[in-house]
Every structure is written in structure tokens, then in C-alpha cells.
Amino acid sequence: MNQSSLLAEFGDPITRVENALLALKEGRGVLLLDDEDRENEGDIIYSVEHLTNAQMALMIRECSGIVCLCLTDEHANKLELPPMVVNNNSANQTAFTVSIEAKQGVTTGVSAQDRVTTIKTAANPSAKADDLARPGHVFPLRARPGGVLARRGHTEGTVDLMQMAGLQPAGVLCELTNPDGTMAKTPEIIAFGKQHNMPVLTIEDMVMYRNQYDLKLA
């Protein structure tokens, strides 16, 4: 079965987006899949606004371990976060910046609590570049202006979801993996979502939703 058929039990694309927005408003996570012809992976996504140590611990335990903080381009500029490399030649042009750590309130920076502290420090609307040490254990990503209508990536999907939910435009993501370390695909992602009460949606769902409601996001 293809992705669309497997996801049909979660409703149509508009319903899937609305369920995800409700979950985020309630402080729960969602699972966002990209296209089967792209990465064909699913990311756990939480809002920074509601992020807890327990949620971070779940991400570290169940995912790849590379926890990323998705920020608007404007906020990343405010924090003076340069690209991780000068010449980004990755296949999907993922916009990693230098990694970060909070200067205050952390120990080694790698624990769930420390990563939450770093993330909330960086995403604070009044944050300054000097609040952060570089490098660190959190990996910021710059969302392209225009969101999923400009780039159909998990980074843009994360920031768009937060804005659509009326939350602070910052979220965390990490790629869901199987117990054997392989990447989770649609059937495993759906099973995980049911187990952890996380709605499942796709980036294509979000594109359809934004186009239907003509949402102009940053």
C-alpha cells in the first residue's frame, strides 16, 4: 500500500492537518512525513512553547539522536547563526547552522533537560546571540521564507505548523527510527503515532491546506 492509502484512516488531508494543529495546541507531538520520493521519513515534532523534559527524553530514546531546532530565518539572523558549512551540497539543501548550547543553566549540554534549556533559551523572542555557546548539542535549522510552499521539507513544515497553530514559530524535530536503528517508514510511523497519541500528517497535506485556505505565512 502507498502512503496515501495507509494514512486514509486518519481522515482526509485537511482533517489530518486540523488534528495535528489541535495536538500541538494541547502540547502533544505530531508525526510529519515527507514525500515517498524524497527522504520518505517521519519526524516527531513538538512545539518549543510546550516542550517538556519527558518529550525530549522520548525523542532521544526513539529517534536518531540529532535533535534539531527549527527557527524562522529572521530569528536565526537575530541569533547570528551562520551556516554549518559555507558550501551546502547536501541533496535536500537542509539549512543547518552551527550547533549551539545555552551558556547558562546546563552542565554537559547533552541531557534531555539541558537540551530543553538550550532550545528554550535560543527560541526566546528576546534571546541574544551572546546567550548561546557554539558548538553544542542542539542543531538549529533555518526555515525558508514561504514555508512548505517554498520548500517541502520538515524544517519548513515544523515552523508552518507552529504558526498555523497560533504558537511561537519554533519547533523541535527528530527523525523516528526503528528499534534496530533503521529509519521508520510509513507503517512503523503510523503504529508509533497510535501508541503515543500523535496525529500523523504529510507535508503534501500541509501544502493542500495552505493553498485551500490561502494562508500567507512568514
UniProtKB/Swiss-Prot annotation:
**UniProtKB keywords:** Lyase, Magnesium, Manganese, Metal-binding, Riboflavin biosynthesis
Describe which pathway this protein belongs to, using the record's wording. Cofactor biosynthesis; riboflavin biosynthesis; 2-hydroxy-3-oxobutyl phosphate from D-ribulose 5-phosphate: step 1/1
Site entry: Essential for catalytic activity: 137, 175
Q: Which reaction does it catalyse?
A: D-ribulose 5-phosphate = (2S)-2-hydroxy-3-oxobutyl phosphate + formate + H(+)
Cellular compartments per GO CC? cytosol
Top enzyme class:
lyase
Q: For Mg(2+) 1, which residues are the binding ones?
A: 39
Question: Binding residues for D-ribulose 5-phosphate, per the UniProt record?
Answer: 38-39, 43, 151-155, 175
Q: Which domain of life is it from?
A: Bacteria
Q: Which GO terms describe its biological process?
A: riboflavin biosynthetic process
Q: What is its EC number?
A: 4.1.99.12
Give a yes or no for keyword Isomerase in this entry.
no
State what this protein does.
Answer: Catalyzes the conversion of D-ribulose 5-phosphate to formate and 3,4-dihydroxy-2-butanone 4-phosphate.
The record's subunit annotation is: Homodimer.
Q: Return the protein name.
A: 3,4-dihydroxy-2-butanone 4-phosphate synthase
- Protein source organism: Vibrio vulnificus (strain YJ016)
Instruction: Kindly list the organism's lineage.
Output: Bacteria, Pseudomonadati, Pseudomonadota, Gammaproteobacteria, Vibrionales
